[in-house]
């Protein structure tokens, strides 16, 4: 594939509540392809595997919480990056609140196996 200015956008959703709506919004905005991975926050994993009274207390507090996150990554032309980010903001809302998620991007220097 001819290399153009490409980006990878990572979105970690702490709740699956918005996943279907986000995928529909991506599709209607011309954002196609991507990968969705089940993921787990490091704090949850540490609590699950740690010993001691403090961790037992935290484990009890977190037991009713979300077991997994959804991590979406999209490889897309740089000119579609802002569109993809806006889709996330419109569907998920402000990511700066507590336990909503995180979104970040990187420039890609090389891609193999990506089809149009």
Stretches found by the model and what they are:
Residues 1-116:
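Positively charged, small/polar-rich N-terminal and surface patches that mediate targeting and assembly
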């Amino acid at each position: 594939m001819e290399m153009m200015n490409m980006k990878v956008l990572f979105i970690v959703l702490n709740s699956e509540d918005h996943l279907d709506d986000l995928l529909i919004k991506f599709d209607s905005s011309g954002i196609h392809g991507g990968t969705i991975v089940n993921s787990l926050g490091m704090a949850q994993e540490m609590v699950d595997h740690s010993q001691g009274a403090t961790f037992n207390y935290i484990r009890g507090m977190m037991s009713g919480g979300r077991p997994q996150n959804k991590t979406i990554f999209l490889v897309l032309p740089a000119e579609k990056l802002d569109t993809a980010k806006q889709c996330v903001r419109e569907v998920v809302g402000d990511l700066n609140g507590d336990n909503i998620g995180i979104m970040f991007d990187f420039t890609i220097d090389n891609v193999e196996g990506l089809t149009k």
